Amino acid sequence: MNTINNARKKESKRKIEKAFMQLIQTKEINEITVTDLVKNAKINRSTFYVNYLDIYDLAKQLKDRMFQDILELYQEEAIKQKHSYDYLKLFKHIKDNQIYYKTMFKLNFDFMNYYDSHLEYDDAIKYYGTTKNIDYHIEFFKAGISAIIKKWLLNGCIESPEEMIEIINSEYKGKSLEK
């Protein structure tokens, strides 16, 4: 019985999240009502409240799951406590989950903060050759990657993930970020 209930709960949450991600593309979060959401998800209002306190709780849970997804994407690197410069993995994930990432940007979720806890200063120093202003270089890089991802999503991810890596590398004068 619990397996059936768990499957139902997961399916309900999936419907709610899907409806939310569709609505957030055309509305601001404060304009989305539970009524709109349950109507689009084709579920009962009580089903929503079994899973979430309100729309903001739903958004928070989505953000938390997004962060977990990114951590899982780089699980091996997290275990080794070493930053990964494998942006191809990230761009492939974004292309496969476009509405998810569009939703996160719409909710102002700064998933680039992932780098704050994983970026290795030693690697950045090797790349730049100095510790002078390293914090500024790192912030500039994070903002640049974030802007490129937003632009790519707005354009419908027309370019391949491989082309996006080429664009990033060209911004760094062909230098590989891996050293």
Locate predicted features.
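Hydrophobic alpha-helical segments that form the core
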Residues: 132-155, 159-174
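Short hydrophobic/aromatic patch on the recognition helix
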Residues: 42-52, 145
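Short amphipathic alpha-helical segment with a characteristic S/N-K-E followed by hydrophobic residues
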Residues: 31, 54-59
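Append "Primarily bacterial transcriptional regulators
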Residues: 16, 35-40, 48, 94
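Helical hydrophobic small-molecule/effector-binding pocket
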Residues: 79-120
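Basic, helix-initiating cap at the start of DNA-binding domains
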Residues: 1-23, 27
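Amphipathic alpha-helical linker/stalk segments
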Residues: 22, 26, 32, 62-86
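Amphipathic alpha-helical packing segments from all-alpha helical-bundle domains
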Residues: 107-143, 177
